[in-house]
Regions:
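C-terminal GPI-anchoring signal of eukaryotic secretory precursors
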Residues: 428-448
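Aromatic/His-enriched, Gly/Pro-containing loop or helix-boundary segments
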Residues: 71-114
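Extended glycan-interaction surfaces of carbohydrate-active proteins
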Residues: 1-38, 62-68, 74-77, 81, ...
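Short amphipathic alpha-helical coiled-coil/interface segments
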Residues: 118-122, 243-258, 367-375
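Inter-helical turn/loop segments and adjacent helix faces that build the functional surface
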Residues: 101-113, 230-245, 356-362
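TPR repeat positional signature
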Residues: 44, 95-98, 220, 224-227, ...
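Alpha-helical support elements that line or immediately flank enzyme active sites
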Residues: 40-70, 286-298, 347-359
Length: 463
């Protein structure tokens, strides 16, 4: 598995950069798979989960060094490993990646040598992607959004973007659409009705993409936990003034989760519409990100918050599907919508519920139920097609997802990493099919998928 996805960038890229679109990095990388032949930023968090479980600490350290080098060169981590990606990023999971590595192999010198670069990446999002929002009481909150102020088509999808914009009336409208499409790519959710704004609804087409008018709940939840993690890192280094600084930033962001994103009536967090000055009350799996980050907001009981959230999920009917939780309930033909399910979103929801097991009695069992559904759909797809896919269809167990701008891709880095993490956590309880009573069903499912994933010898430290 990892051998198939491993790449080493040729030194010719370093020696003659004008002849190549790749970004040179010194250490080996893991690519997602399929058509994606370069590394990508946020994918790597879940890939690293799997690499660490495979004992590949040195490979992970090398990947982190690559990302840190890019922060030094570009001020942030680019979307992916191509020169044309350097003007946009992706969801900032570098600090959580670093924390995963530190949790497996704490390296004080590595942390000390790179803490300034970790902070530099945080400040890119904290400053360069910041907007101000007022809550109902007139208090100002600093929030972040995906916003790429580059007004030409995406280089990797130039033809599609150019064609989409052709019937717009003015050059300014075309340029703004290009900004929105690039901002959607920066979000990682390219594309979804989540970013459609049409008369203050999410009904529309790709031309209604308006990412820069939306404040994403998951991005701000992620920056909250990033601030908490920086505080932890500074404390480990004995840098107590910096620890207190990031304690304050984290607390401000935690308050914002309550004041801007939390909907007390529905019992969930939502994206915020800057123009309408209101929350966008639609189901997207991004709404659940705060249960993974732990940034629930300081108000009220966490147990009560979890109770309301589980009720919300039941009321929305998103727990009824055998193939996992859908990305949204909007059947738009976009890949980050119904009926698709994505490994990173399943992981965030499952792990968030699992971490809440001591907060609410139902959270751990729901976490297990979702994990079991996800592993079953991975296993069935692997049995039938001998591949792991980037996305799956929640309505048919084992079926690959579809929609969007390209065919579903096999590989697949983050799907592999999530499966390995869930097998590690729940492997002793999983069953291959609902109601299965065969001997040792947990062993057959867990070992079957794990052996498939490990069939190319992931335990070998190949780099």
């Amino acid at each position: 598995m990892w051998k198939k996805l491993g790449r080493k960038i040729s030194t010719t890229v370093k020696d003659d950069p004008e002849k190549h679109s790749q970004i040179y990095v010194p250490n080996p990388v893991i690519v997602p798979g399929g058509r994606f032949r370069e590394f990508y930023y946020w994918d790597s968090y879940w890939t690293i989960e799997g690499l660490l479980l495979s004992g590949m600490n040195q490979t992970v350290k090398g990947m982190l060094e690559n990302f840190l080098m890019m922060v030094k060169d570009y001020g942030m981590v680019p979307n992916g490993g191509r020169i044309y990606y350097t003007r946009r990023s992706q969801p900032p999971y570098l600090i959580p990646m670093f924390k995963l590595y530190m949790d497996h192999h704490f390296d004080q010198d590595f942390l000390r040598d790179n803490i300034e670069l970790l902070e530099k990446e945080f400040l890119f999002w904290h400053n360069e992607r910041q907007v101000k929002v007022q809550d109902r009481k007139g208090m100002t909150h600093h929030v972040a959004q995906y916003r790429v102020n580059v007004s030409d088509p995406r280089p990797e999808s130039y033809r599609e973007d150019y064609a989409l914009a052709q019937d717009l009336a003015t050059e300014e409208e075309k340029q703004q659409l290009y900004v929105e499409l690039k901002s959607g790519a920066e979000s990682g959710w390219d594309y979804s009705t989540r970013w459609f704004v049409n008369n203050e609804t999410n009904n529309g087409t790709m031309k209604d993409t308006n990412v820069t008018s939306i404040v994403p709940v998951d991005l701000n939840s992620l920056l909250c936990v990033n601030a908490q993690t920086l505080s932890y890192f500074y404390n480990r280094l004995g840098m107590h003034d910096k620890k207190r600084e990031y304690d304050r930033i984290a607390e401000e962001k935690n308050i914002t989760m309550s004041k801007i994103f939390w909907d007390q009536t529905d019992g969930v967090w939502y994206d915020y519409d800057l123009n309408a000055k209101s929350r966008r009350r639609y189901f997207y799996m991004s709404n659940l990100h705060p249960i993974w980050s732990g940034c629930y907001g300081p108000e009220g009981s966490r147990a009560r918050t979890m109770e309301k959230l589980i009720k919300y999920l039941n009321n929305k009917g998103v727990l009824k599907y055998d193939g996992g939780m859908p990305t949204s309930l909007e059947d738009s033909g976009q890949q980050w919508d119904f009926p698709n399910a994505w490994a990173p979103l399943q992981h965030l929801a499952i792990m968030g519920l699992y971490e809440a097991r001591n907060i609410h009695h139902a959270a751990e069992e729901l976490s297990f139920e979702l994990a079991e559904k996800w592993i079953r759909t991975n296993w069935k797809g692997y049995q039938e097609l001998h591949a792991m896919f980037e996305k799956y269809n929640v309505t048919v167990v084992g079926k690959a997802g579809g929609g969007g701008e390209y065919e579903v891709q096999p590989g697949f880095g983050w799907s592999n990493g999530v499966a390995m993490r869930l097998l590690e956590l729940f492997g002793d309880r999983l069953t291959p099919t609902e109601g299965n009573s065969a001997a040792s069903p947990t062993l057959s499912l867990a070992l079957g998928l794990l052996m498939g994933l490990l069939s190319l010898g992931v335990r070998s430290q190949f780099f």
